């Protein structure tokens, strides 16, 4: 019969085996011995369930099925980091540090793990709770799933009560194996290890999380000062003595030159790591100096994340296809041999225009380098000419539209070729897609595939036809059931009440963007007033230049446009501005009256367009860059150089929550 002393001894033995294997990568026993000890432990726990504690190694295998994830408030906010993209950004950061605390500084440089930020709470040395970062103030309780990560100790080497921060991630090998299994089972593949790690930690079945072989690196304590250390580097060393896994590749740098060398080294070596990194984190090493620097609403002023340049990958250019946009612009698109770039498979990429293809001498059949601009949009950088075999074909832009065969023209001062046939089917189709989009009429359920079906089956020929669609016709479309058709018709009906600026933007008048549409709607109040306006009147309005004014006058001079507007009126589409008028609002309501506001970073609750609309409704003008003329910067998470520049210029910083306080009571924008 087992005694409790043996049970506790087994827990300590298995914890040590796990530490040796998962934390310091120095296994001391064979798998068979580990398994034998684990089986002995499980038998004891089966006989004595009253002895089982949350720290038992048996709890790492999962098995618990969760009902959901509770919200967890972080006692100390989990701030995000401002970004640097080049040496100039890093030099600016360094100068701000030196201006504040002097030249006696050092930076701890660490690899920026591409995973999921988490916090671990230990009470008297025992693992108590784990949570996601969330919005930095409130995260989700993922205690059970984090317990399945073998490199997280259930007990520290000392009985500290601390909150530790780190990055949970999926090693490359585990990611590859997971996707191989999912492919065999016909499941959707994960785009990258980061997404796989995040998805694994949000599994309600902890057995699934346990099977994913996640790992972690710890990089901070909520307050290192509580541990009696004076530097960040000493704090990391102490975490290691507690049995926590800290990345070994960190380096203390005493100058920017040493920082640059560290970055260059890991830019070259990153591919050889067993896990993904997407940059380097710099932290002012002295904790007292960190306190002097302080923090902004979203990020510490004493730390910054250098982001690696976009990944560049070679592949074969199979063909060049031409796309016709809603304004008739002909855009060449590269058809590529599929290749993975920055975590996703890319088979098409932008070539922008004919001049760029000629300038870069890009030929069909070339091996080309591609990257994702801003790690989002694939584009062709250049041809690798030394790999040419002689069979490659130079590309020549056709003289006629690939859709309607009309002659293409190049307008004055433009690099793009255009189809100027107003009846071009491709332009009409793209115009319809634009009309229903979120920034325009915002008709839910009318995605690109539905529009293409409606257009190809001749159920719509222009935007007015959308408002006369019948339930019977919609039910004939592929994948359109009773419920989806009912919802779509309700969305179409609701869109009729949109304010005038939404309709104006949706009509796709050349040069008229969402901002100009809003200015026009506010100034003229009705479509009838606008359509008779002359150039002089138009150019007297803010945001309306001569080129745009000419375009507006030309648009409304077209008899077909008059017919279209009459059809829209007949359908009951609103043609009046119904948004707030600045002159009707009090000074207190117009918090941004006459001010220039810049949005930066990722917003958690508002879309960028909603935030922009809210700022404009409060009298502000939204700008894309920070300067001395900027009055306010609204900063979301992961704000980069714009936030840093705003701080340097002492421009007031608002958080997203500050902005949300000014939402209308009805709780929505552009309803």
Curated annotation (Swiss-Prot):
BRCT domain location, by residue?
Answer: 587-671
Please write the reaction equations for the catalytic activity of this protein: NAD(+) + (deoxyribonucleotide)n-3'-hydroxyl + 5'-phospho-(deoxyribonucleotide)m = (deoxyribonucleotide)n+m + AMP + beta-nicotinamide D-nucleotide
> Which Pfam families does this chain map to?
BRCT, DNA_ligase_aden, DNA_ligase_OB, DNA_ligase_ZBD, HHH_2, HHH_5
Catalytic residues, per the record, are: 112 (n6-amp-lysine intermediate)
Q: Which GO biological process annotations does it have? A: DNA repair; DNA replication
One function term, GO molecular function aspect = DNA ligase (NAD+) activity
Q: Give, as one word, the top-level EC class.
A: ligase
Q: Where does Zn(2+) bind?
A: 401, 404, 419, 424
Q: Where does NAD(+) bind?
A: 31-35, 80-81, 110, 133, 167, 283, 307
Q: Which SUPFAM superfamilies does this UniProt record tie to the protein?
A: BRCT domain, DNA ligase/mRNA capping enzyme, catalytic domain, Nucleic acid-binding proteins, RuvA domain 2-like
Cofactor(s) for this UniProt protein: Mg(2+); Mn(2+)
Q: Which cellular component terms (GO) are annotated to the entry?
A: cytosol
Which InterPro entries does the record cross-reference, listed alphabetically?
A: BRCT_dom (IPR001357), BRCT_dom_sf (IPR036420), DisA/LigA_HHH (IPR041663), DNA_ligase (IPR001679), DNA_ligase_CS (IPR033136), DNAligase_adenylation (IPR013839), DNAligase_N (IPR013840), Hlx-hairpin-Hlx_DNA-bd_motif (IPR003583)
Keyword Nucleotide-binding listed? The answer is no
Keywords attached to this entry: DNA damage, DNA repair, DNA replication, Ligase, Magnesium, Manganese, Metal-binding, NAD, Zinc
Top-level taxon: Bacteria
Q: What is its EC number?
A: 6.5.1.2
The cross-references to PROSITE patterns, in alphabetical order and at most eight, read: BRCT, DNA_LIGASE_N2
| SMART domains associated with the record | BRCT (SM00292), HhH1 (SM00278), LIGANc (SM00532)
- Name the NCBIfam families on file: dnlj, PRK07956.1
Its function, per the record, reads: DNA ligase that catalyzes the formation of phosphodiester linkages between 5'-phosphoryl and 3'-hydroxyl groups in double-stranded DNA using NAD as a coenzyme and as the energy source for the reaction. It is essential for DNA replication and repair of damaged DNA.
Q: Indicate the family of this protein.
A: Belongs to the NAD-dependent DNA ligase family. LigA subfamily.
Name of this protein:
DNA ligase
Gene encoding the protein = ligA
């Amino acid at each position: 019969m087992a005694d409790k002393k043996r049970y506790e001894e087994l827990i300590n033995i298995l914890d040590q085996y796990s530490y040796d294997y998962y934390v310091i990568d120095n296994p001391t026993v064979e798998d068979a011995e580990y398994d034998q000890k684990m089986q002995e432990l499980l038998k004891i726990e089966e006989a004595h369930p009253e002895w089982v504690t949350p720290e038992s190694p048996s709890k790492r295998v999962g098995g618990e099925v969760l009902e959901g994830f509770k919200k967890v408030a972080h006692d100390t906010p989990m701030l995000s980091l401002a970004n640097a993209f080049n040496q100039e950004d890093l030099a600016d950061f360094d100068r701000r540090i030196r201006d504040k605390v002097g030249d006696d500084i050092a930076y701890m440089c660490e690899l920026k793990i591409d995973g999921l930020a988490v916090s671990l709470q230990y009470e008297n040395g025992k693992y108590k709770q784990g949570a996601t970062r969330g919005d930095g103030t409130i995260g989700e309780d993922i205690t059970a799933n984090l317990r399945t990560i073998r490199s997280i100790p259930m007990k520290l080497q000392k009985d500290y009560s601390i909150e530790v921060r780190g990055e949970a991630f999926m090693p490359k090998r585990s990611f590859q194996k997971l996707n191989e299994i999912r492919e065999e089972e016909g499941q959707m593949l994960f785009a990258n290890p980061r997404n796989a790690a995040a998805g694994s930690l949000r599994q309600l079945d902890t057995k699934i999380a346990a099977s994913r072989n996640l790992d972690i690196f710890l990089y901070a304590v909520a307050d290192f000062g509580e541990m009696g250390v004076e530097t960040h580097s000493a704090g990391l060393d102490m975490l290691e003595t507690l049995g926590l896994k800290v990345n070994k590749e960190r380096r203390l740098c005493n100058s920017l030159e040493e920082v640059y060398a560290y970055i260059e080294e890991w830019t070259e070596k990153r591919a050889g790591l067993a896990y993904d990194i997407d940059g380097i984190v710099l932290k002012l090493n002295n904790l007292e100096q960190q306190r002097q620097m302080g923090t902004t609403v979203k990020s510490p002023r004493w730390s910054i994340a250098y982001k690696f340049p976009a990944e560049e990958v070679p592949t074969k250019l199979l063909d060049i296809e031409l796309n016709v946009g809603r304004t008739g612009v002909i855009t060449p698109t590269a058809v590529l041999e599929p290749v993975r770039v920055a975590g996703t498979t890319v088979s098409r990429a932008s070539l922008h225009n004919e001049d760029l293809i000629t300038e870069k001498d890009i030929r069909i059949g070339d091996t080309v380098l591609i990257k994702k601009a801003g790690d989002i949009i694939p584009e062709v950088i250049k041809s690798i000419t030394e790999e040419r075999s002689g069979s490659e074909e130079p590309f020549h832009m056709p003289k006629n539209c690939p859709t309607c065969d009309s002659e293409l023209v190049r307008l004055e001062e433009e690099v793009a070729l255009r189809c100027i046939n107003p009846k071009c089917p491709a332009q009409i189709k793209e115009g319809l897609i634009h009309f229903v989009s979120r920034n325009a009429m915002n008709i839910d359920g009318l995605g690109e595939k539905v529009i293409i079906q409606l257009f190809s089956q001749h159920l719509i020929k222009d935007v007015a036809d959308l408002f006369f669609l019948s339930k019977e016709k919609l039910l004939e479309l592929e994948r359109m059931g009773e419920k989806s058709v009912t919802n779509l018709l309700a969305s179409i009906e609701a869109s009729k009440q949109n304010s005038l600026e939404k309709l104006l933007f949706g009509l796709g008048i050349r040069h008229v963007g969402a901002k100009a549409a809003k200015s026009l709607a506010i100034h003229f109040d009705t479509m009838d007033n606008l359509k008779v306006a002359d150039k002089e009147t138009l150019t007297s309005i803010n945001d309306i230049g001569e080129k745009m004014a000419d375009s507006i006058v030309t648009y409304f001079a077209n008899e077909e446009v008059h017919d279209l507007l009459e059809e829209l009126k007949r359908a009951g589409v609103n043609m009046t501005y119904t948004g707030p008028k600045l002159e009707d609002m009090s000074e207190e309501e117009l918090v941004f009256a006459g001010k220039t506001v810049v949005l930066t970073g990722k917003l958690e609750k508002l879309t960028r367009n909603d935030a922009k609309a809210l700022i404009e409704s409060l009298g502000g003008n939204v700008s894309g860059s920070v300067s001395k003329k900027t009055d306010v910067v609204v900063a979301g998470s992961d704000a980069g150089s714009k936030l840093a520049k705003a701080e340097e210029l002492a421009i007031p910083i608002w958080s997203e929550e500050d902005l949300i306080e000014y939402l209308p009571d009805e709780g929505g924008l552009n309803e």
